[in-house]
Every structure is written in structure tokens, then in C-alpha cells.
Amino acid sequence: MKAVVLALTLAFVAGQNFAPEFAAGKTYVYKYEALILGGLPEEGLARAGLKISTKLLLSAADQNTYMLKLVEPELSEYSGIWPKDPAVPATKLTAALAPQLAIPIKFEYTNGVVGKVFAPEEVSTLVLNIYRGILNILQLNIKKTHKVYDLQEVGTQGVCKTLYSISEDARIENILLTKTRDLSNCQERLNKDIGLAYTEKCDKCQEETKNLRGTTTLSYVLKPVADAVMILKAYVNELIQFSPFSEANGAAQMRTKQSLEFLEIEKEPIPSVKAEYRHRGSLKYEFSDELLQTPLQLIKISDAPAQVAEVLKHLATYNIEDVHENAPLKFLELVQLLRIARYEDLEMYWNQYKKMSPHRHWFLDTIPATGTFAGLRFIKEKFMAEEITIAEAAQAFITAVHMVTADPEVIKLFESLVDSDKVVENPLLREVVFLGYGTMVNKYCNKTVDCPVELIKPIQQRLSDAIAKNEEENIILYIKVLGNAGHPSSFKSLTKIMPIHGTAAVSLPMTIHVEAIMALRNIAKKESRMVQELALQLYMDKALHPELRMLSCIVLFETSPSMGLVTTVANSVKTEENLQVASFTYSHMKSLSRSPATIHPDVAAACSAAMKILGTKLDRLSLRYSKAVHVDLYNSSLAVGAAATAFYINDAATFMPKSFVAKTKGFIAGSTAEVLEIGANIEGLQELILKNPALSESTDRITKMKRVIKALSEWRSLPTSKPLASVYVKFFGQEIGFANIDKPMIDKAVKFGKELPIQEYGREALKALLLSGINFHYAKPVLAAEMRRILPTVAGIPMELSLYSAAVAAASVEIKPNTSPRLSADFDVKTLLETDVELKAEIRPMVAMDTYAVMGLNTDIFQAALVARAKLHSVVPAKIAARLNIKEGDFKLEALPVDVPENITSMNVTTFAVARNIEEPLVERITPLLPTKVLVPIPIRRHTSKLDPTRNSMLDSSELLPMEEEDVEPIPEYKFRRFAKKYCAKHIGVGLKACFKFASQNGASIQDIVLYKLAGSHNFSFSVTPIEGEVVERLEMEVKVGAKAAEKLVKRINLSEDEETEEGGPVLVKLNKILSSRRNSSSSSSSSSSSSSESRSSRSSSSSSSSSRSSRKIDLAARTNSSSSSSSRRSRSSSSSSSSSSSSSSSSSSSSRRSSSSSSSSSSSSSRSSRRVNSTRSSSSSSRTSSASSLASFFSDSSSSSSSSDRRSKEVMEKFQRLHKKMVASGSSASSVEAIYKEKKYLGEEEAVVAVILRAVKADKRMVGYQLGFYLDKPNARVQIIVANISSDSNWRICADAVVLSKHKVTTKISWGEQCRKYSTNVTGETGIVSSSPAARLRVSWERLPSTLKRYGKMVNKYVPVKILSDLIHTKRENSTRNISVIAVATSEKTIDIITKTPMSSVYNVTMHLPMCIPIDEIKGLSPFDEVIDKIHFMVSKAAAAECSFVEDTLYTFNNRSYKNKMPSSCYQVAAQDCTDELKFMVLLRKDSSEQHHINVKISEIDIDMFPKDDNVTVKVNEMEIPPPACLTATQQLPLKIKTKRRGLAVYAPSHGLQEVYFDRKTWRIKVADWMKGKTCGLCGKADGEIRQEYHTPNGRVAKNSISFAHSWILPAESCRDASECRLKLESVQLEKQLTIHGEDSTCFSVEPVPRCLPGCLPVKTTPVTVGFSCLASDPQTSVYDRSVDLRQTTQAHLACSCNTKCS
């Protein structure tokens, strides 16, 4: 029956107004409660929040206008263990808000929809938002004909998708309505972001896991009444969860529960208030003072000036000697106080503190951190009034740019600054302000849907004016500003200066084009499609400079191109002729193809497909070609990632790159940000350093060279590059600074430096240091991070997610001088040299940093939040005393005891819930997130809401849940994990112990995930403390230089005995020897004992015949006296020193047999491939006559080698020892080394030149440490270093002895252990020549080495298996020789053969190809320059020079391409020249009638002719012949040198880019400096590494064959009377037959010049050449050389002509 009644009721209501209504003349009384709590989901943990309880009076005030009043409101704070602890009434806060809460508000309400809200001005925005939270419950959009539907509905939090569900309760005849609002699906979501202007949303990251989710459920019980429905009950349950990581790793929650229960209807209306009601918005939340309020502390401002004064005093007083642990929080308090200050207040504070140095410093550092317009205006006004320095202004502006919230008012202020003369006059400030202007526009546009074009128009206009005036520096600056702003309207302005074909912008300098392309990247973030099209157009333009195309590629891939676009680029790369562009694009796509799917999913997939198209061919290009590297990592579980990208751009395959860019990107919590980017252009750095300082601009030089090149057909010079180095820095995608360095700037800086009285400043600083000392304190506060997101809850209370990080760094330096004798005030340097100076310094660097992560409620009157706080404090004090006596050569440094805190560095991380309110500023209710005591699981009856004291049937519905249930449940018990570890390391010598301690109590026992592991408390600390019983009084280092150095040595070495002098006399010495010999005898059975050397000596003696035969092989050093192998057993040192020679010449017979058989069987030839390793048991024979194969025989210890190997070894030995002929005079042989050691094992005190003592002085005056003695024996060219332990009970020491046997050989013996006897090794290094190639050998032999070396070697070999290392590990086998030899032979300037012989007699041969040239001639002492500076200059230039050569009628270009050059008779060809307008050099080549080559070199005003004459090569300089031997020395006026070299002559002019021109009767060779690569042209090519575009003709066209290319570089004759006897001219030839093109008869002319005889001459020598022809029906106006090619045909080119007398 009830169901029927309800059905009839619903049917009746469907025809009526189905919306809540409140009848006029009645007052509806409701009870309202709201509880907002934040914390982790589990019960038994701490939460913080706010509770609101009140009665509501609701009545109609007018038609569709209602009045709402709160009665007996009560606010309660919650900070405790939920649900055990109760909320605490905030009586004072309630009383403070009571006057506002007592004022009723009015609102429009029509058909269940809340409209405008009205309230008096006395009602604050905060209280009005609480009303909005109540009105949100009344918002009902009920449709008459639908039971389930959704719509975008207005609510407190914005306009979000809301799902309605309507049902009926047949038992009580009520309507049940539920609506669910998805806060992640909103048309308009109300929130405010602060400090997040530079972050971007990572869409793909958010697809995998949502970091911020929210949903609101509202459940209603509606009762049908006469004309509408009445709300009986309403429950609201909202959940907002935030996960800093992935959702699987835990999330913190903010829960809001509201309840509204109908109580009664009163007939008395709500009493009216005498106040003016104003329109105060709508149902939507309104942001207010919470934007300025930090969530870390509440400050009740009663007397702002006094509070500011107190905080400033605290910061200035307590951060001098040490940084106070609360300094960061106090700094944040000062920020908060100044953030709410008006400009007038700041002016008042400034006048009060500007003359108080520490207060002024703290004040100026805090103002920019406030991020307010008033603060920015204050900085501007003080700078304009010159009350702050330029340094203070620059620092303040840089900080303010990134802290100030951007709005039109702030942008206008920056606009006024850019016009200020004071800013324009200072380059640094001008740059900061202009770039800041662009940043402000960018920040404002990021948060505004429609960003006004007017904001950026001033810069666009400036750019247009600068282009019109050709002001390059200003153009670059304005482009950077537009790039920072990233406004889409700037796209048109930037397009106008792009190097698009056919536009006027093509003529602009390339630096402008570079900046314009890079400025597109920020625009691409908003208009990717538009930028994408332009970038692709630039990239596909093959005529564009390669660097610009590569930059376009960077921009293109930052726009997230589609699969089709990436495929288009890949197909373009397949046919790309420029290898720089191909290499860069390929490497870029390859790097992106490996990117994780989360970071670049679409681009990575597209690039993976592109890699399949391209293959791996381009992988073989070397590092001289441009590359892009992208590396990224993303952890989905933590939702954290990082990416790093590096672009290496080159355009001429030079040794140094033209430019590079490196940038990093971070991913965290679903957002991404470009953290840091650094770029540099060093294109002109080499040229700036190595180029001749000033080229002569004389008319004669320029005219001569231009006259020559004018003869070339359609000559077009390359643009002259301006020597320039530039660097820029970007932070969060915004350029914050850049610098362009060129020659004028350097000259200006040098001039400025000369004008400054630097010497005077230095003298005054030295006087201040030595007379009065230094006492310096400095502190710097930094607000490193302030990132906030504020969003309203359904109850109208704002919640906040924020991250704060503040730090205060300080340093205290105090230096006290003491001089003896005391210096006068006007002392000079001479006096100082005779003064004993002592300085005592105490240094205390300190830092304190606080970091807060907050989630909770934040208003200007109350706060309740969950907080994670990390406090870092670090102090590293040091006290040092230094003493210097230059006259005596004494230096002493002491580290003195200093007060060290318990922990040098400590960090405490705690998580807690906190609640506070403004009326009780000294009361903070803090509850640790994890309870400190384990909870007892006893049943607790929870607090039951009084809204429904009796359970009724309505509560049985699953759709409606009361705010707090009555179920009795035990509170869960958690056993929280406690973890503590301590790691210590101590050093007895210095008496200190260092400990790292870690203690943690976390919630991993609740859930073993990241968030719960971080919850709780954690402590990290690092301490350094004295060791008990080993306290050190001080650490000392003493240095003594000079003849009296030995006086400082603590331990003396006996000059006649092997032992140290010890107390006890000779008896103890003899006893020591006896015990030592017994120890040796007892260990004779061990292979590693010292007696093994004796057994090897005996084996060596028994096989003397084998050794004598083997010793005939090359030994790089003079022969060793064989008697050394049988030296007395008493002299262990002598035995050890000779072991290397004896072991290298002796081996077992089995080893010899194996070596012989292996040698005879290994006859395979070795190739010259780079780094190919041949490993054999003996020498590998090679099919080619190479130094590698010859040197392989050096290592054969066998006497049964083949005769050919013996002959080769003997031949190589003779060649190698050519440079050792002069060694005999110095007496440097192996036997002399033994004689030197035998004569005097230890050098005496008179040879000591340096003594160094390192010691620690203990509290009981004991000294421990080491001494180092440096001895020099000049007559024998011997150096000895002895390091000894100065403890009386220790005989440990290191002995190193080096003897220079000749200028080509040095040997070193190193031994260590007890009395330098336990371990020893010999190292011999020598140089020589093998097959005319410089060579060097390093031989290392040892007697015994520590076992730890072998252990570590095994560990390394386990992870990095290397055969050589494996051989070294197994040296204890019977056939091992305990030595290793390495020989390096420079077979050419770019290749080295390295041959290594291991102790297992294995030989490894590696041929290495080097990226640069080895200065072989300089090694041989054949440098063309005598001065050291000139030599260095020459060698640096030569290292990466490009070479072009002519050998046996084949020309090898700079790019190593070869072709046959069919040279014309008597006509010059341009072999190589500087193709820029500077014309630094030119090399011409011709062949005379007798088929002899002539070379002409033009450098500066000098003409050099080299040609064969008789059997020699002759040189003329400016038509004056220089008699042999030709030699011309470089001078400042003559920047070149001519020198005889081998069988010819060589010209050197590296400062002009011409490294070397060598010429003899059969060959010639041209080398250009590395910085000239890409700027040359001629027969030798451009030296740019572009082998696919090798044949560039003078007009820039690429010829299809080498013949046409070579002919284009002929210098034609002007007439038959030309002195050079050249009778050729270059002309376009007509094709003999006519062709029909497009239906018309056309005449065809060659578009490439062809050499033909002059009129009146007949060809006597021709050659066929294929050239391109252009065919047209009529004669066009354009030059034939500019036409396109229609077909290619073969024609005849003339090479030699015969002329008659009529030839003119």
C-alpha cells in the first residue's frame, strides 16, 4: 500500500515543482556539522583538522531570495590519534569570529540552484566561504523525468561533472537522492598555484597514476510537501587524496564530512541586520588572504614594525659565529611579515635599517623572496634613487623575477625599467631586466587563457627597429626576450628574421638566425603545429647552413612530431648529402627511440620505426660529426624520472665542436620541468687563440689576391666568421643570463684591467692581512623552493599542498698575523722576504636548511595540517696556523684543535600533525604521525553524532551513512619498526674517528610501501670525534727547501750500511741480519719468497748460451753485465735491481720450445684495422713490413727464432740505436746503473734538497707520521725519494730511485716495506727510432708484489675480463718472467702501433688511429720554430690540421678523397685558399711545359714561389731567389717561416691558418689549421668532412665528377702574351646538336665552365669531360652558370694549346 502511495506521490510531484523550497513566513531550523581531517587512511595514526558545529536558521527574505544565519557556532581543533583523541574546542577563535558568524547572509535560490550571494563588508571572505560550504548542500538540479543523469554542476569547488541518482524509500515515503561529484573531471576547477609557473603537466605520467584525485558524495533524504520537497537530512562525504609517488606507494588523504539535519520550523523570521548587503560573488569559493599565508606558522601581527625589528635583530645577532638552527624558520617569518607590508611600510623599514650593515643585508635579501609587487617596486625605486648598489640591485632583480607573481601591474613595472637610462647604461642589469621582462610575460600567460598581445608588443617593436638599424647585439637580446616570453604572437616577428629562401632575412648574420630558431621552443609549447611546420621547412632546405638545419631538428623533435613526420625526416636522412646533418638527425632519433614509454611515448615509437628505415650505416661516423645524445630514466613506482640531453654540433669536422647544448629535465608527482640548460658556442675560440692577431688590411695584399680570384668563373666567397664565443644559462626553461665574447670585448677587458690599480689593491690587501688581520662574517638566506597548490574543500575551507625549502648559509673567517721582526706600516717586498710570517686562521662554514612538505588546512586564522619536516644543520670548523720564512726556505702548516659540535652534519626528518590558531599564537597542538606508545587494543565506543540519537530505518540504506558510526571496533595495534645503524672508521695516526649514524622509526609495518617508510622519524648524523687514548694535539706539515733540508728529517739513513741507525749498536744490527737470513731460509720452498730470485739466477747461469744468443736481439738499452745475475746474496738490493735484466733474457727450455713452435706456425698477416688485437704465444709475423711485426721480435726470449726474425731484429736494433750513439760519453749503461747503486745506496745529507714532514703530535707528546726526503745527485743525474715512518718502532719506508742514463733513457727502482726490502719493482723508459719512426718503450719488472694487488686484479678481471690482466694475475707459473713491456711506435702522425708483452710471453699488437696528429717532427727535434711560444702554437695547430697531398699523379683532398688531376699546361690552378673575404692565404699550382710542378704561396704581402731547378728545389720570395739551404725565420712583421725539410722545402704560417706547405720534385703537401676547416676551397676541397659534397666549384655548385671540378679551379689567361704561358680560358660551351625540349627546338649551353684555347690557338692536348647543359629556346637574361641542368653530355676540354703569331 505504501508503495502505491509513494508512486502516486512521485507522479503528483512530477507535475509540480520538484525542487527544495522554503515557504515564506517560516524559519527552518537545521543542525549543521562539518569535520575536515587530514592524514593517512589507517586509524590509530595522527590526523589534524577542524570541526564546525552550529544551528542554521533559514528563511525567505524576498521572492527567490533567502536569508541564512548561524546560531551558537563552535569551532574545534583536532590534532591527535584518530579516533582515540577528541577534538579540542577553540573557544578563543570562536569568540573572535562570533561577531562575523552572527551576521546573516542573503542568497538567491531558484529551483534548487544557488545564485548570487550577498553579505555586509564586515563578513570576511573566510566566513563567507564557510557559508558557501553550507549553501553547497542546498544546490540541487533535480530533473523531473530522469532518475539517473549527469551534468556539469556549479559547486563550491567549481564546475564539475556530477552524477544524480534518485530512488524512493517505500517504508517511510521519502525520496532518496545521491549525487556524486568527480573533482578530476571539471570544466572549471578552482585552485591556485604558486611557484609552479615553470612546471608542465606530464599527461602520460598522469595516465598511469593520478597524483591528486578527489570525489564528493552528497546523500539526501527529501520529503515531498505541497508544492516542492523539503530536505530532511543530508550527508556529505568528500575524499581528496594526494600521492607524491604512484598510488600503489600510498597516499595521504583529506576527508571532509558534513551533515545537515532538519530540526523544526519556527514562525519567527530571522531578525534583520542594519547593514548594507553587497553582492559578494556566487556559490564558487573565493580566494583571500590564504594566498599570502605560509602554512608553516601563524603570526599574529599586532605591531608589525616591532615584530620586524625583533626578527631582524635575531637574524643579525645569532648568525655570526654560528648559524642558528631556527634561522631558516626565522627567515620565513621575516618573509611572511614583509609579504603583507605595503610599499610605504617597506620604505619606513628601509629608512630605519639602511645604515645598519647586518640588518640592511638581511632586509635586502628578504625583499625579493616576498614575491610581492610592493617588494619589486621597492627594489626599483631604491635602485633609481641610487640607494642600493648595482650588485645589490642585480641580485635582487634576479631573485624577484622568479619569485614575484606575474600580473599586468608587474609587467608594466618591468616595461618601465627597460626604458630607464640607469638600466641601459649597465650591461649586466640591462640583460637581467630585459630577460626578466620576457619571463614575467611567460609566467602571466601560462595562467591566463587569453594572453594580451599588448604585453609583448613593445619588444616586438624594438626588434623591428633594431633590424632596420642593423644593431646585431640588440637584435639578439630582443630575440632572447621573445624566446623567454614564448607568446604565440611573436611567431610572426621571428619568422621575419628566419633564413627562408627569397627573403631579406637571408642576409642577416647567422648568429641571429641561430637565436631566432632556438627562440621557437617556448612558443612550441603553446602552438606546436605552427612551429612544427616552420621547423620542418627549415630542416628540409638543403641550401641552408648545416648548423641551422640541426637546430631546426632540435626544435622539430621538441614539438612531439607524429609518426608520419618522423618518417618523412628519416627518408630525408637516407638521401642527405651533408654528413653533419645526417649524423646529428640519426643520433637524435636513435637516442629518442630508447626513451621510456612514459616520457616520450609517441616520439619514441616513431623514432623506433625510423631506425628500421635508416639501418646502422650512419653509426660508423666518428665523433667529429655532430651528435645528439638523450638519456632518460623513469620509475613508475615512484613516479619520479630524469632526462638529460646533449647536442654536439659541428659543421666542418673540426677537432673542437662549434657549439654544444646540455640540458636536464625532471619528472615528479605527475609534473615535469626543464631544470637546467647550458649552451655554448665556441666556433671562433680556436681562431681567436691561434689566428694572427691582426691581419694586414693593406690595399696591396687584398688587391693581389682579389686579382687572382677574379679570374675564377663566378667566384663566390664564403661569409667571414666573426671570432666569437658565447654562453648562456637557462633555469626552468627561462634564460637568466648570457655572454658573448669576442676580440673587442677581450681587448676592452684587458685595457680596463690595465687601467685599474690592481697592484695597489694587492699591496693594500697584503698590508691589511699582515698588519691587522682579517675578521669576516657573511650570511646568505635563500628561499630555495616555495611550491603551493591551494584548493577548496566542499566545506568551504581551503586545503593546501605545499613544499617549502629555506636555507641560511654563513661563513666566519678570522685571520690573526704575527711577524718577526714586526713589519712597519710601509714595508716593502724586500723586507717581507726577510721576515718570519705566522698566520693563524679560524674558518667556520655553516649551513642550516629546513624543508617542509605540508598537506592540510591553511587560513590566516587557523591551520591544521600533516607536516613532514627535514632539518639539516652542518658546521665544519677548522683552525689552521701557517708559518713561512722565505729566506730560510721554511714552511710549516698546523691544524690545531678546534671546538667541534657533537655532529658536524645532522639531518632530522619528522612527520607530525599540527593544529594552531591565531588567537593562541603560542599554542601548537603537535602530534607525531606515528604514536610514541603502542596502543592497547581495547574496545572504544566512538563519539556518536547527536544528529541522529536513535537508529532509524533510513540509516539501514547503503546509500546514506552518518558522519560517525556507532560500531565498537578495537583500534589496531601497530608495532612500528625501529632501526638504528652506526658505521665508524678511525685513523690512529690523526687520532680521529668518523661515524655515520642512522636511526629510523617508520610505518613500514602498516604497509611496506614508500610513503609509510618515510612516515615517522629519521635521523642522519655525521660526527668526527677524538679517539680515546689517542688524542692528537695538532697535525703538522713542515717543508724545508735548500741545502739544510736534511736538518728537518726525523730519521736518518746510514750512508754506509743497509740498515737504519738504531739504539743498541752493532750487536742488534748483526742479530737482525742473522734473524733475517733464517727467515729467508725457512721460506725458500715458497715460490713467492725472496729466495726465488736466487733460483732464477742459477737457472739464468745454467742457460747462459741461450741467454747470450737471445741477448743479440734488440734491448732498447745498452747491454747488461751478465755478472750481475751472480751477485752476492748479501746485497738483496743489487739482486733485485738486476732481476729485470736477467729474467728478461732467461727462460726455461720448455718455454723456448713452445715459443719457437708457436713462432713458426703463426705466419698469418696482420691487418691495419683500428684496435685489432692479435694475441699469440710468441712474435706474430706480418705480411707487411711494419714496425709492429718488427717489434714483435723484441719480446722473444727464445734462442730458436728463425734467421729472418734474427735479421729483422738486428736491423731494427741498429735503426733504434741511432739516437743512442752519444750515450757512451755519459757513461750511461746498465752496468753503470749497478755501479751507481753499489757505490752509494742512499744519497747523503748533502744531496738532500727538500724535506717534508707530515706528523701528528699526540697529547703525550708522541709523534706519528711520515717524512719525505728528496735527494738530488746532479753529477750522476740521479734523484732519490725516501718516504719513512717516523715512529721509533717502525722500519717501514718507500724508496724510489731514478737515474737519467741519457736524454733517451731513464730507469727507476721503487721498493717498499720493512727497510724497503719486502717489495720492489723496476721501471725503465726509453725512446728511439724503429724504421725511421719514433718509438718509446716502458718496461716494468718486479721481484715481489703485495697479494692485495693480485686480489684486486682478480676482482676487476671478473667484471672486466681482459686477457692482458689475466696474464698478469698468473705470473707465478714456472714459465712467467715477472715483467711486462710496452712499446709504442708512431708509424705515422695519426697511427700508433702498441705492442705489449706479458709475463706469460704473450704478445698483443694493437694499431690505434688517433683523432689528431702527433708532432713527430717535434719529437725528433725538427720543429720549424725556435721560440717556445711559437713551438707550442705550431704544435697545437698541427695536432688537428687537415692534409692535402699529391703523390704519383693522384691528389688526395683534405677529406681524404682521391682523384687524378689532369693539369693544364702552364696554367695555375688554385690548390687551396682561404675562401672567406679575409683571404689569409692562397696556394697556386701549375705544371710547366717540361711537366714540372710549380707552387706559388701568397701570405700577407709575401709571394713565395717554389719550383725545381737542376736537382734541387728553389724558392723565391717576392721575386728574390734565396740561395740554398733556403731558410727564412719568422718575425713579428713576417708571420711565416721557410725551411729545408727532407728533400724539399716547407713553408709554415700557422697563425694565418696555413699550417704547412711542403714541396719537392715529386710530391707536395698542404696542411691547414683546424680552425680553417670548412673555410678553404680549391683542388684540395673544403676540409669539412663532407665527402658526399666534395667537389665544390668556385660558384658553390657541387660538380658531379673530379675532372669538371678540377677544371673549374683553373686561372685562365687574359691574353696570349701572358707571362705564365697559359693559353686557356674558361667558357660555357654550346652543345653541337640542337635538342627538342618540351616541343621546342632548344640550344644548350654548359652550366659548368670548360677550359678552351684562346682565340688564335689550337688545342694540342685534350681530355673528355662530362658537364651539365641547360637548354632554352631563347637567350634568357640570367647567367648561364645560374641555370638548372637539363642533361649531361660529354665534351672536350683543352689542356694545352699552340698559338700562332696572330694570337692576341
Curated annotation (Swiss-Prot):
Among the record's GO biological process terms, what is one? response to estradiol
Q: Name one GO molecular function term.
A: lipid transporter activity
Where does the VWFD domain start and stop, copy by copy? 1442-1617
Enumerate the spans annotated as Vitellogenin domain.
22-660
Tell me which SUPFAM superfamilies the record gives.
Lipovitellin-phosvitin complex, beta-sheet shell regions, Lipovitellin-phosvitin complex, superhelical domain
Q: Which cysteines are joined by disulfide bonds?
A: C1444-C1580, C1467-C1616
**Any signal peptide, and if so, which residues?**
1-14
* Coiled-coil zones: none
Q: What tissues has this protein been observed in?
A: Produced by the liver, secreted into the blood and then sequestered by receptor mediated endocytosis into growing oocytes, where it is generally cleaved, giving rise to the respective yolk components composed of complex suite of small cleavage products.
Enumerate the residue ranges of region (Disordered).
Answer: 1078-1213
UniProt keyword annotations, A-Z: Disulfide bond, Glycoprotein, Phosphoprotein, Signal, Storage protein
Low complexity composition bias: residue spans: 1078-1109, 1122-1204
PTM text = Phosvitin, an egg yolk storage protein, is one of the most highly phosphorylated (10%) proteins in nature.
Q: Which residues are glycosylated?
A: 446, 635, 903, 908, 1019, 1054, 1080, 1121, 1174, 1285, 1322, 1375, 1379, 1405, 1456, 1512
Describe its function: Precursor of the major egg-yolk proteins that are sources of nutrients during early development of oviparous organisms.
Name of the protein in question: Vitellogenin-1
Which species? Fundulus heteroclitus (Killifish)
This protein's encoding gene: vtg1
